[in-house]
Amino acid sequence: MAIKSVPILICPNCGGPLTLQEIDQCSCEQCGRDYPVTLGIPDLRPPEFIVKGHREVQVVEKLLDIYPSSDHLSLIKAFFSELDNSQVPKHLVSFYQEHLIHQVNRGAQFTEMFIERLESQYPLPDYRIACEIGCGIGAGLLALSKHFDFVIGIDPDLATLIVAKKLCEQYHLENLLLIQAIGQKLPFQANSLSYITAQNTLEHIFEVDQLMQEFARVLKKGGCFTADSRNRYDLFFPEPHVKLRWVGFLPRRWVNAYVHWRIGMDYMKVHAQLLSYWDLRRALQRSFPNRWRILYPKASAYGGSKRIDSLIDILSNLPGIAQAGLMIFPSHLALAQKQ
């Protein structure tokens, strides 16, 4: 869909309305700033967040070169082959690649779980416009497009958005727009979105309070937000990015040195900071006072059995024990509604 047909978009610099003047350029009517457009994907990042290294440019050029003759899976593999994994242990390289390849199927399971749990707590005002923050290669976009009139995918990385663009083309999605942007400063008018969702994303955005404030700004009255958040104090499974147990129990300033000592990898490379139950609770309460919940997610959405889901349902209904269990459970499901 053309950018000019999405009137909720605003300039990240001044907040003015955006117009599409040329096929490869988007301009602000108010301040005159121009924003480049690649394959119909506008770059609406604030200037201070634009850092283009040689490696990033190289990956994008490779994907654009093979784009016309490639399918979604081929682009995923090409994208992964261009990443600098020289300092990453081999077992993690294999894990990252498999994670990417199966991300769309997992994204559909997450999307359905999010909406099912949300509808049991807070009714959506309508099913008009949904936005996925950190959409990456398009994990949840297909499923969202079946529920909402229009879907917007946001990610700061152009290379992954190019891969997502191919997925949308393969499934002939007409009700979707991809935008290179950041969650901390969304290029949307206030009170414009019905639903915001984020899969495996919160731990990669360190300014969680700012992120939640932006969600509250752009959601319309009654609009809702859902996200999963891996627990910093998970007792049961290894840290999801480096596969080491109990990393979150260390002081944050020690984590990088510990991970490097154990597996020879710089933890900052994964750009992750897992949230505890209390971290997540504080962020939700500040932006969505009294209209938020932290629930147990379905284990089946992560590849677990439905039998575990049944046990989790029992646990979640035990007074006192349910909240205590959330402190150490592997993952949290955050729900919120704007009043």
Regions found by a protein language model. Name each.
Residues 209-214, 224-335:
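S-adenosyl-L-methionine-dependent methyltransferase catalytic module, highlighting the catalytic core
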Residues 144, 214-215:
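Class I S-adenosylmethionine-dependent transferase superfamily signal
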Residues 194-206:
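A short SAM/SAH-binding and catalytic strip from SAM-dependent methyltransferases
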Residues 185, 203, 232-234:
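Active-site micro-motifs of SAM-dependent methyltransferase domains
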Residues 205-206, 219-221:
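Helix-to-beta-strand junctions that scaffold the AdoMet/dcAdoMet cofactor pocket
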Residues 2-189, 195, 329-333:
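Conserved N-terminal segment of class I S-adenosyl-L-methionine
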